[in-house]
Amino acid sequence: MAKKFIKGTELVQAGFANGISTQLAAKGEFGSLTTKEKQEIIDNAAAAYARFLEALGCDWQNDPNSEDTPMRVAKAYVNDLWAGRFEPLSGITAFPSDGYDGIVQESNIPVTSMCSHHHQTIGGRVSIAYVPSKDGKVVGLSKLNRIVEHFGRRGAIQEQLTVAIHNAVDKICEGNIGVAVMIDATHNCVSCRGVKHHGASMQTAKLSGCFLNEEAARAEFYKNIELAGVCRH
């Protein structure tokens, strides 16, 4: 299936935190970067990072532990840490719910991202739930993990990441009557700099439909999180 952007999930301007790269945006809705174009981005980023190290007084060229660091860092950003900036979300197939109209929830989904302010890592867990209508759509369970992985690998403002995951699930699971997303994550920009507080975590949630308007649905969502051992309420 051809890769494409899912309309309604891009919250910010291309190049901004939580957004796609300007290079990918130039390709249009159905575009992807070629291997050659990605390599050019890596080469340019490696050269820029080498200058960054030199500005900090790092003699990377003569240090055997650092001589390949600019290229390693550039590859890590493009192929891993920010991979979601350089590829659109793959087409995700939704299937008829076949009359099922109960809660569908996956908790304890790992998320790894990077703080957009100081480029320190973020790590945590995501819980996602939705309720399909009887004639609505459901997706394979691993697709929820894929959505988390895609948007997490962009560099994140956690609040926007929460909304992006919610919007993607909402768009893909057509005819749903509610979507809920919660992220519980620790930020190394808090533990490694500034206040240097270890163990502090941040919770963000985006609820819509029945999860926002009905106490019973909301309580079931948070109870399932508790049962999964993500956090205690």
Predicted regions and their residues:
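A domain-level signal for the structural core that forms small-molecule/cofactor-binding pockets
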Residues: A2-H233
